Amino acid sequence: MAKKKSSPSVSFETYLVLFRYFLGEIGTTELKSLGNKLNSIEYEGLDENGNTHFHHYIAQIAKMKHCSITTDKLREYDERICRYTKEIGENRGGISLKYFQYISLLFTEMYLDNYFADRSAFCKSLNEFIDSENARTLGALAMEPYTISSMNKLAYMCATGSGKTLLMHINIKQFIFYLKRAKRINGSIAINKIIVLSPNEGMSKQHLNELTLSGIKATIFNKDGGGMSSGQNEGIAIIDMNKLKEEGKVKTVSVDSFERNNLVLVDEAHRGMSSTDGVWYDYRTRLSEEGFAFEYSATFKQALNATSSKKEDRQMVAEYGKSIIMDYSYKYFYGDGYGKDYRIYNLRA
């Protein structure tokens, strides 16, 4: 009897279709080619008009490669990124973004703009790219298409010490901008609460301190009333994910008490992806089911099993392949000259 042919192996990086889609949108195929140029002090900071030097280089490449995105649109995104960076840096002595942080924020601007402007057309464009990737890998990738309902999550795979906290704070501002703009056209669009899910009580306190430093109103969730107000104008509720349960008890709260149209930001989002603690993944998914989620982790790759033959593992890998918008994992961090214990503070020179 002939041996059954095994499916060709696909690397985890091959699954990152969303990340490659946006690299292509600005005229490149890999982050390293941008880093070789932009990982330099001469590109950090702003020009005389208040725009980043990163913006000028990316606009030049996009124009040279005949990308559909215009210089004016890139400048518009750049101006918002600069404004948000200035706002969260006022109490920090100013912030100067690194190139990988800037690209993360640029891709987020591009995604949210398309997501809120014309979700159907955006979904079609993403699926055309998936079709081309499936063909390029001769069917080995076998990525299922996006659906409109599956587009409400972005994930950032960024190395420890690379400044994920600052990304989170600017992501909040980015989302609120596009949400408010969309509400002018469709008044029924709404977010119930903005929630930061932290892995433990100590990290909740750290998030509160960091959000306060960035000038963003926040409170640590209190079951008896604190942090339960609706709407982003009431500030952000920081919740230790261990306090979420199916049914609330003395020190916990039922996940369903928050409704499902929330903006949820998940720290250390790799937690909850294993079969032993998958309940946390279920809880946070329900919180953002009719809203939106931003997830952050240095170790998505380690938490996801790209070589598994189990259906549930392959589905999870595909889900995050279509959600990870930035891969600045440790290999890039190390390659850019940052050591294992390095931490970026983004201090303005």
For the regions a protein language model found, what residue spans apply to each?
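Flexible phosphate/Mg2+-sensing switch loops adjacent to catalytic phosphate-binding sites
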Residues: 115-149, 177-193, 221-223, 305-326
